[in-house]
Amino acid sequence: MLTACFAGTVPAQRPDTARLHRTLDSLAAAHHGVVGYAVRDVDGGARFSRRGDETFPTASLIKVAVLVTLYDLAEHGQISLDDPVTLLSIDKVGGSGVLYNLHSGLTLSVRDASQLMIQLSDNTATNLVLEKISIGRTAAKMDSLGLRSTRVHHQVMLRQYTSVARDSSEKYGLGKTTPNEMAQLFTLLAQGKAVSPKADSAMLAVLETNDDSELLVRALSNVRVAHKTGADDDVRTDCGLFYLKTRVVVCVFTNKNADQRWIVDNEPQRLMGRMGAEVAMAFGTTGKGTVEKP
């Protein structure tokens, strides 16, 4: 249970990352499921992980790779973010998002579709973007960044018709990655090296609009976080850039969760909230940022 609240927490000295590592490992070990994570101090250089090179299902977290690929193609003049995409009835898929409920024939820019893909994790919008850029290009972009385990397998809810890797798709679902690779992708975004400083800044601004506050950020108030979540029956994932006293990338993956209830306070979501809180307390928040102590 989250109780006490700490405002503007500032460590008296350099963050004790060894202690934080032990704390996160203890939380992960007590969880009824498989937990992998990676933490990176972008500015200070400290980094540590648990199951960091193990492959995990991403659920909707893989949409970050789609966003990066889209902006990379725009950066190189192969598409424009203002290019129109038209919503057809055949494009609509269920799950998260709003486009499913809007009228067929609606036209929006690919930029707006990508915004919905991140802010609302809109599945239909994601497929519109993937139609524009192709799944194969996401693999090529991830390879160019050295992220060879980070893959989009198929369009959302259309595995049977669009899978580019049938066996991996059946094993991991929509996408796969490792904690270290996804942490590296967010580190590159923070450093302006994923696409370009301007494009990366724009993507981080989009990621800050993420509406899902039930995982890593659930114990934080007035703390800037650029992140993306993912959820499936036995999967919860969240990865993002935390703007603390230093910029910190935090990625947590849970799989094979015993508690598969679709409620706010299921075990993996509570776990991830505690892990996010521990990181924020260790590195210290700024301004009016507060953390509810586990």
Question: How does the language model describe each region?
Answer:
Residues 92-127, 135, 171, 175:
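Conserved catalytic neighborhood of penicillin-recognizing serine enzymes
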Residues 1-7:
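Bacterial N-terminal signal peptides
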Residues 36-40, 49, 65, 86, ...:
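Soluble periplasmic/extracytoplasmic beta-strand elements of cell-envelope proteins
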Residues 45, 57-85, 250:
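Active-site SXXK
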Residues 13-24, 132-134, 184-224, 229-294:
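Structured C-terminal helix/loop/strand segments within mature extracytoplasmic catalytic/sensor domains
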Residues 106, 127-186:
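Mid-domain, small-residue-enriched loop/turn segments at the edges of structured enzyme/sensor domains
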Residues 10-54, 278:
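Beta-lactamase-like hydrolase cores
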Residues 42, 81-98, 133-134, 155-160, ...:
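Acidic helix-start/capping segments at beta-turn-to-alpha-helix junctions
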